[in-house]
Design a protein with these regions (language model features):
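Hydrophobic, membrane-inserted alpha-helices
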Residues: 15-23, 42
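Structural signal for membrane-spanning alpha-helices in multi-pass inner-membrane proteins
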Residues: 24, 47-51, 110-114
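Membrane-interface helix-boundary motifs at transmembrane edges
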Residues: 24-34, 119
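Extracytosolic (periplasmic/ER-lumenal) interhelical loops and adjacent juxtamembrane/interface segments
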Residues: 52-95
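Aromatic-anchored segments of alpha-helical transmembrane domains
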Residues: 11, 41-50
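Hydrophobic transmembrane alpha-helical segments in integral membrane proteins
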Residues: 1-17
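Cytoplasmic juxtamembrane regions at transmembrane-helix boundaries
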Residues: 35-38, 106-127
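Individual transmembrane alpha-helix segments
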Residues: 6, 82-117
């Protein structure tokens, strides 16, 4: 069961991150992407106030599964993902900085595009 959970977490978590990073591209997915980015920020900074900054329940649960499988994982899922995909082993501080900068960038982009889309929709409806 754990090997299947490991793969499931890897697919789900990676898809969540990819959607956070790219979901703003398509107008129809922007509200959903803004919601997933907001949930991510709420986890990192809301739950993070109690469990440690950058806390992600998905990472926590995935690490529990991987520990039972005998894996010795880095502190950050981003580190694991980059290592698995590219073979590059990032330092923890660099991985954290990269994650925060990307989250801040896509959050700003999402809010600006969402507001622009809302204004355009209201302008169209008022005509």
């Amino acid at each position: 069961m754990d090997p299947m959970l490991d793969r499931l977490f890897f697919v789900f978590h990676t898809a969540w991150i990819a959607f956070n990073c790219l979901g703003w591209i398509w107008r129809r997915t922007r509200p959903w992407q803004l919601a997933t980015v907001s949930l991510t920020a709420l986890s990192w900074f809301g739950l993070g106030a109690w469990y440690g900054w950058g806390y992600c329940p998905c990472t926590d649960w995935h690490w529990q599964v991987r520990a039972r499988l005998g894996h010795d994982d880095p502190p950050s899922y981003i580190q694991l993902l980059i290592r698995e995909v590219t073979g590059i082993d990032l330092r923890p501080g660099l991985a954290d900085a990269l994650a925060v900068v990307i989250l801040a960038g896509v959050t700003l982009l999402s809010v600006v595009l969402f507001a622009r889309d809302r204004r355009a929709t209201r302008a169209t409806l008022s005509c």
